[in-house]
C-alpha cells in the first residue's frame, strides 16, 4: 500500500505546533549537532548558513559532485573551511561522527538520498518536495515508514514552523473564521531566463529546475509550498483536481511557465492554485487566502492578515526569515531527544502537486486514486 493514512499525515502536520522556545539556543559547543551537507548549491548554502549561525550545529562535511560548489560553500560559511569534502554521498553517510544530514539536491534525487540517510540512521533535514514523480514519492514514503523512530525527520516546508502561520492555522482550526468555504494559493514569481551552460552533458543537471523529469515541473518544485498550506489548513488532501497550463514564453527545458488548478477536498471544499513565471524577476506575489463565513484570512511568509468583516483588519508581521524558525526547531528537537517524522505530510503535499500536474496533462478531472495508481 502506497497511500498515506490519516494518522501518518496528521502526525506530520502537528510538527509545527507546540514550537520549542527560542531561549533553548544556549547549548555547549561540545554538544553541538554535527551536520553533513549533501548538495551545496544555492539552496543548500542558504540552509547551511542558518545551521552554522545557530551555534548549536557544526557543519563537518560537504558533499557535491561539482567541486566549485563546495568551494563556494566554504566561502559563504567560513566555519566549513576544514569540513571534509566528498563527491559520493554514500561516503559521507558512512561517517559515524555525523549526527544529521542537510539534503538539498535536485528533486529527482530526494528519494534516493533520503532512503540512504534513513538506512544510515541520521537525523534528516531535507529540502522539499518529496520527489518528482509518483514512483519517487512512493519510494521515499516506504523509506520513511522504515525510519528509526529515534531520528528526527523534517522537510523544507518551512512555513509550518513560522509562529505567524501557526497562529493563522489556529484561527481556521478553532472556527474563528467560521465555516471554511474556499481556499486559494498564488505563486506568481518571475525569474531571469535560463541560458544553457557551455559544458554539456553537465548542463542539463546544473539546470535541473527547468526539466520535468528532474524537478517535477514548477507546480511540484515550487508550488508545493502553497499546496502544503492548503492541505494543512483543510486537514485533508484533495480528492480530485482539474486544471490547465502551458508554455508561452519559456524556450528552455520542458516545464510549464503558467498554470491554474482547482482541487476538490472532502465536503466540497475547493482549493485553487494560480501560478506563473511570466513576470519580471523582481515581481513576487506568493500567498494564500482562506474564505470563511466570518471573514477572510491571508497568509504570507512575511505576515498574516485577518479581515473579520467589521472593525480594523488585523495584520501581524513575521519577526524574521521563517527558515530560521524551521532550522531552530529542528535542532531543538534533535537536542531534546523529541524526534518527529514529517515525511508523511510532506509526501501528501507532494502527491497533491503531482495530482495537479497530471490533471493538466490529462486535460480532464483526475482523482487522487488515479494519481496513486499511475
Predicted regions, residues:
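N-terminal secretory signal peptides and thylakoid transit peptides that target proteins
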Residues: 1-15
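N-terminal Rossmann-like dinucleotide-binding module
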Residues: 12-78, 230
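Predominantly a Rossmann-like dinucleotide-binding segment in NAD(P)-dependent oxidoreductases
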Residues: 39, 146-154, 158-253, 261-263, ...
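Conserved SAM-binding strand-loop segment of SAM-dependent methyltransferases
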Residues: 83-88
